[in-house]
Every structure is written in structure tokens, then in C-alpha cells.
A protein has these predicted regions:
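Bacterial N-terminal signal peptides
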Residues: 7-17
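Ligand-binding clefts/hinges and TM-proximal coupling segments of bilobed small-molecule sensing domains
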Residues: 171-183, 252-326
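Pocket-flanking alpha-helical
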Residues: 76-80, 91-132, 200-204, 220-227
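Immediate post-signal peptide segment of exported/extracytoplasmic ligand-binding proteins
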Residues: 26-62, 154-165
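An extracytoplasmic/periplasmic, membrane-proximal ligand-sensing/linker region
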Residues: 36-38, 200, 217-231, 236, ...
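Bilobed "Venus flytrap"/periplasmic-binding protein-like clamshell domains
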Residues: 59-82, 90, 145-203, 207
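Sec/Tat signal peptide C-region and signal peptidase I cleavage site
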Residues: 17-23
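Pocket-lining segment of extracytoplasmic ligand-binding domains
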Residues: 118-119, 128, 186-288
């Protein structure tokens, strides 16, 4: 075929194609004959490009832990439930864990809040001799991290670890190990060389190179539950709720249903649990970031009941807006919200209820409690009762 003919044909084809394209983008497409449907008009409205100041004003970030654990899931849940387009947006950030999260909250400009365990300040006192709580404020307790210790069955309780070598990954186990063993005056040798690698650290115990492995994490932990414990050589070690631990931890337990490979059928193992707190830097009240977090707190507290329902993480049922954490000061907007709720609900529902609660506490030998302490306890009781009904 001659070149000029090819060019002519190509031009004709292009003309036909363009004619079809123009027809397809005409303002109105008429319906087929015999129908009564209205003509379709293509949408021509364009979106306004976001304003950078508005985007930043409504965005807060939360640093968590490696993907897959409860900490990262909790932040993702908050991002989904509380999203309000330009008004409020939560950016979850995968972090290393509670110890590094403190450093990131203090020094990373892009981090507004983070998840920190209640025993982390104790770790900083031991390691650095400094109190970090005067530079931080907690918003609320989110859930509990149970302390897991796996060791050979001849080690029955935590006290049997005297003089032993402990695998304690830095950001998931070392901080709890230091706090617990220091409080209980148990001398051990720590190996934290695996940092965040809790699987590699556990393998050291499986291979007989270490005597025990410790991590603080929400049960049920897949690594522990899926451990192939041939001959049931390993088990979960008991941690009694010793008085020396009670300002840092809550009592908890593991069951054979949770860890059938590490606990004999029908038995339970005592342990302790550290609260996981949502923590913010102690900003001045007039600071822009203080105001941003304050707006987030109002949204979170106002919708807290939504988190206790599926498909959210089941550990949300342990969340407590009003829990008082020893050694910590609460973020003022969070405390203000609780105080307002207290004024609206405590005596409004039943004017005699607080007085009756005070009588009950007196009968139980707690007559020395101040009015403020009574009101906080009563507030916690009401919240617990409300959650139990849900």
C-alpha cells in the first residue's frame, strides 16, 4: 500500500474515533426511544484542593509498636472510628515499643502521642536515674499487657530465676524484667541483644542457651500459643502478685484454654499485667499541639463505648477513661472531660447513690478515704458497671 494512502486511511480512522469520543462526552446522553428515564448529565463539579493549614490542624499522630500486635491495632481502631475528614484525622505510626515510644514522644516533631506501659518510668529510673513522668501526661488506660515468662518446667515461679540468664528483648521485655526483678530483689543476667526480635530470643530458650524468656504483651500471644513444645519441656512461669509490685501492675492469669501447649488442661498460672497508657508530651496549654490533642481527647472520650463492640480489638473492653495511674499526672483536658461527666452523671442519676457508696466503703474499713478519692472510686465503679451491661 502506498504511503499516501496509508496516511489517508489513518486520518479517516482517527476522525471516526474522535467523532465517537466527542459523542461520548456530549453534555447529555438521551435515553433509548420508548423509555421515560431522564437524560444523563456527566458530573463536572471539581473538588477543591485541600488547604495545608486545615490538614495539619486536624491531624494527630500516635506512635505504637511493630505491626500485628494490640498496640498497632488500637491506633488503627482509633483512626477508623474517630475520623472526621478535615476536622480530625489520626495517623498511626509503627514504632518499636513502649521504651522507644517515650523518646519519640519527647523528641520526634512528628509524634503527638504514644502508647507507653505503666512500668516504663520504673525502667527509666533504673537505667538513667531520671523521672520521665514530669515531662509526660497520660490520657487514659487502654488495656493490659500480661507479663509472659517461658522457661523449663523445673522453674516453677519467678523466684526460681535467681542467678539465671534471661532473654529480654529491649522493647518488649527488658523494661518489665528490670522492674519486676529489681522490685523482688532477684539477681539475673539479662540478654537484650535481640532487641525487638522476640521470636529469636525465645529460640535461645528452646535451644537451651538461655534459662527463660520474658515479654510484656497482650494475651493471647501467637508466638507463645503456637510454640511446638515437644515433651512439654517448657511452660509459663508463675508471677505472684507480690505487694512490692502492686503500684506498677495488676493481677492477672493465664489459662490452659489460652495456652494449651504451655499449661496443663484445667490449670491456671498467675501473672501480673502492666497497663498500656495513651501518653502525650506535657505541652503548655496555649501551644497548638496541646489544643490538637485536646480536640482528639474530646472525640475519643465521647465515643469510647463504640470501641468495645466488634469488630474492634477485644482488649478494648479493658479500657478505662477514669482509671487513676499511680505516679502519673493526667493530661488536663482529659481530666476536665472526666470532671464534667462526673458533674452531669454521678448525682443526677441518683442523688443518694454516692452517699450510699461512701457508707459501704466505711463499712469495708475505708473510712479514711478523702472525698476526692471516694468520688474517683465511685466514678470508676459506674464506668465498670456501664461496661458490664454492654
Amino acid at each position: 500500500m502506498r504511503p499516501l494512502v496509508c496516511i489517508a486511511l489513518a486520518g479517516a480512522i482517527a476522525g471516526l474515533w474522535l467523532h465517537g469520543a466527542v459523542a461520548q462526552t456530549s453534555p447529555a446522553v438521551q435515553p433509548p426511544s420508548g423509555t421515560s428515564e431522564p437524560a444523563f448529565t456527566p458530573l463536572t463539579t471539581r473538588w477543591a484542593f485541600p488547604n495545608s493549614d486545615a490538614v495539619n490542624a486536624g491531624t494527630v499522630s500516635i506512635i505504637t509498636a511493630p505491626a500485628g500486635g494490640a498496640k498497632s491495632v488500637f491506633a488503627a481502631d482509633m483512626a477508623r472510628v474517630l475520623d472526621e475528614k478535615d476536622k480530625l484525622r489520626i495517623l498511626p505510626i509503627l514504632g518499636k515499643g513502649p521504651v522507644q515510644n517515650v523518646i519519640d514522644i519527647l523528641y520526634l516533631k512528628s509524634v503527638d502521642m504514644g502508647l507507653v506501659a505503666t512500668d516504663v518510668p520504673e525502667f527509666y529510673k533504673i537505667q538513667y536515674g531520671s523521672d520521665i513522668t514530669n515531662r509526660l501526661r497520660y490520657i487514659m488506660k487502654l488495656y493490659n499487657d500480661e507479663i509472659h515468662i517461658i522457661a523449663p518446667t523445673e522453674i516453677k515461679t519467678v523466684f526460681d530465676l535467681e542467678g539465671k540468664r534471661i532473654e529480654a528483648p529491649k522493647d518488649v521485655g527488658l523494661y518489665s524484667a528490670k522492674a519486676i526483678f529489681s522490685r523482688l530483689k532477684i539477681n539475673v543476667t539479662y540478654d537484650s541483644s535481640h532487641l525487638n526480635d522476640d521470636t529469636g530470643a525465645l529460640q535461645e530458650v528452646i535451644d537451651g542457651k538461655a534459662d527463660a524468656w520474658i515479654v510484656g504483651t497482650a494475651k493471647v500471644m501467637p508466638i507463645a500459643r503456637n510454640l511446638k513444645n515437644e515433651g512439654r519441656r517448657l511452660h509459663l512461669v508463675s508471677i505472684p502478685y507480690d505487694q512490692r509490685l502492686q503500684d506498677l501492675y495488676l493481677p492477672s492469669e493465664f489459662t490452659s484454654d489460652e495456652y494449651p501447649n504451655l499449661i496443663p488442661p484445667g490449670e491456671k498460672v498467675d501473672t501480673v499485667a502492666a497497663g498500656i497508657l495513651l501518653v502525650v508530651f506535657n505541652w503548655p496549654e496555649k501551644h497548638e499541639r496541646y489544643q490538637k490533642v485536646a480536640r482528639f481527647v474530646d472525640a475519643l472520650f465521647s465515643r469510647i463505648d463504640e470501641f468495645a463492640k466488634p469488630p474492634r480489638h477485644p482488649k478494648w473492653k479493658e479500657a478505662s477513661v477514669s482509671a487513676v495511674i499511680p505516679g502519673w499526672q493526667r493530661f488536663k483536658p482529659a481530666q476536665d472531660w472526666i470532671d464534667r461527666w462526673h458533674e452531669q452523671h454521678l448525682d443526677a442519676a441518683n442523688p443518694t447513690s454516692l452517699a450510699r457508696f461512701k457508707d459501704f466503703m466505711t463499712q469495708q474499713g475505708h473510712a479514711s478515704l478523702s472525698q476526692e478519692e471516694l468520688e474517683k472510686l465511685y466514678s470508676q465503679f459506674l464506668e465498670w458497671n456501664r461496661r458490664a451491661k454492654n
